[in-house]
From Swiss-Prot:
Native organism: Bos taurus
PROSITE patterns, alphabetized: SIRTUIN
Organism lineage: Eukaryota, Metazoa, Chordata, Craniata, Vertebrata
UniProt cross-references to SUPFAM superfamilies, sorted A to Z: DHS-like NAD/FAD-binding domain (SSF52467)
Keywords annotated in UniProt: DNA damage, Glycosyltransferase, Metal-binding, Mitochondrion, NAD, Nucleotidyltransferase, Transferase, Transit peptide, Tumor suppressor, Zinc
Extra facts: According to some authors, ADP-ribosyltransferase activity of sirtuins may be an inefficient side reaction of the deacetylase activity and may not be physiologically relevant.
Single biological process term from Gene Ontology: positive regulation of lipid biosynthetic process
Gene3D superfamilies tied to this protein: SIR2/SIRT2 'Small Domain (3.30.1600.10), TPP-binding domain (3.40.50.1220)
Membrane spanning stretches: none
Protein name, per record: NAD-dependent protein lipoamidase sirtuin-4, mitochondrial
Transit peptide: first to last position: 1-29
Sites where the protein binds NAD(+): 63-83, 144-147, 261-263, 287-289, 305
Leading EC class: transferase
Highest taxon above the source species: Eukaryota
Cofactor comment: Binds 1 zinc ion per subunit.
Length: 315
């Protein structure tokens, strides 16, 4: 069950936004959104190596913390997460579905942020997990991220728990469209539209003024004329039951669980930690800062994912 079909990663045509956003994003500092962490503890690295060596059916769950080193911020990290830097909050599912103006605002902001968000590339942590899969160490990978970076790194035994921003769905007929194709439709409908944006979010959102949003034209489904929504689980929505059941089965098949870059504050991911605990699986957590499940972990590491994971030999 690979949840990553229908992706294209070509760069889209140039869009009209003012220089300060593109210059800001072009810095691509890998440390911009990564919280400070202590130096690697050699003894803990050895413990993680021992854990991986003994694991025969390892399940890995990743969160936003694995992608901060690729230049995509997370929500909750102290000082550098979206919640710490701004008073903005993610869009709510009910608001998006019910309100055309909310959808217009969302898509205008997403249109501006898309070229930078979609151009982000995997970092050493993504490549390490892909290599673990290739060498037969990884039983399954569950990501809470919507950035497609695991897919770009070549991971195939993958479930995108919250969907993927690289796909768009019609709310009426379910027609699926690659996000890059929709970007071209946006450009055709808004040939002279421009905006000044600030602050990329974990889902590719940026911040615009209401005046900039009001003139933005949003296309409808090319098949039925219905409203379009990214194929992701917005806040206030729930993961589909069949996907939850699928991941529960993968957890029950596993003999160990590694959490990478997640505070586990969201129940959609935390519930699988509870399943692992019920099954008495050893749990290791790699995340800078406290998590909801630190008391359940046999080992907790506060290190950069891209610094630590490549040091581990999966064989």
């Amino acid at each position: 069950m690979r949840m990553s079909f229908g992706l294209t990663f070509k760069r889209t045509a140039k869009v009209h936004w003012r220089a300060n956003f593109s210059q800001q994003c072009s810095l691509r500092s890998t440390g911009l959104f990564v919280p400070p962490s202590p130096p690697l503890d050699p003894e803990k690295v050895k413990e993680l190596q021992r854990f991986i060596t003994l694991s025969k059916r390892l399940l890995v769950m990743t969160g936003a913390g694995i992608s901060t080193e690729s230049g995509i911020p997370d929500y909750r990290s102290e000082k550098v997460g979206l919640y710490a830097r701004t008073d903005r909050r993610p869009i709510q599912h009910g608001d998006f579905v019910r309100s055309a103006p909310v959808r217009q605002r969302y898509w205008a902001r997403n249109f501006v942020g898309w070229p930078q968000f979609s151009s982000r590339q995997p970092n050493p942590a993504h490549w390490a997990l892909s290599n673990w899969e290739r060498l037969g160490k990884l039983h399954w990978l569950v990501t809470q991220n919507v950035d497609a970076l695991h897919t770009k790194a070549g991971s195939q035994r993958l479930t995108e728990l919250h969907g993927c921003m690289h796909r768009v769905l019609c709310l009426d007929c379910g027609e699926q469209t690659p996000r890059g194709v929709l970007q071209e439709r946006f450009q055709v409908l808004n040939p002279t539209w421009s905006a000044e944006a600030h602050g990329l979010a974990p889902d590719g959102d940026v911040f615009l003024t209401e005046e900039e949003v009001q003139s933005f034209q949003v296309p409808s489904c090319s098949r039925c004329g219905g409203p379009l929504k990214p194929d992701v689980v917005f806040f206030g929505d729930t993961v589909k039951p069949d996907k939850v059941d699928f991941v529960h089965k993968r957890v029950k098949e596993a003999d160990s669980l590694l959490v990478v870059g997640s505070s586990l504050q969201v129940y959609s991911g935390y519930r699988f930690i509870l399943t692992a605990r019920e099954k008495k699986l050893p749990i290791v957590i790699l995340n800078i800062g406290p998590t909801r499940s630190d008391d359940l972990a046999s080992l907790k590491l506060d290190s950069r994912c891209g610094e630590l994971l490549p040091l581990i030999d999966p064989r």
